């Protein structure tokens, strides 16, 4: 996945698959050349629950994939 790929998702809801398992759903607000991303209105989603976490920065190394947002 290249950094240019993320440009089309700026200010839209995305689903981020994490290397440790689970997902983050939120609005993509920014990114850098290392694939670190800024999410607003974030929600951690795993097999058992959904946890609202607000704004956060995710390191590129913790990300498996980023896709268009969808309902869980």
Language-model region placement:
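Conserved RNA-binding domains used in RNP assembly and mRNA/RNA metabolism
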Residues: 1-72
């Amino acid at each position: 996945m290249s950094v240019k790929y993320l440009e089309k998702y700026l200010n839209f809801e995305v689903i981020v698959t994490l290397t440790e398992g689970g997902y983050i759903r939120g609005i993509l607000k920014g990114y850098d050349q290392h694939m670190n991303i800024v999410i607003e209105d974030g929600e951690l989603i795993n097999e058992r629950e959904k946890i609202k976490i607000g704004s956060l920065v995710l390191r590129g190394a913790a990300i498996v994939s980023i896709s268009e947002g969808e309902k869980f």
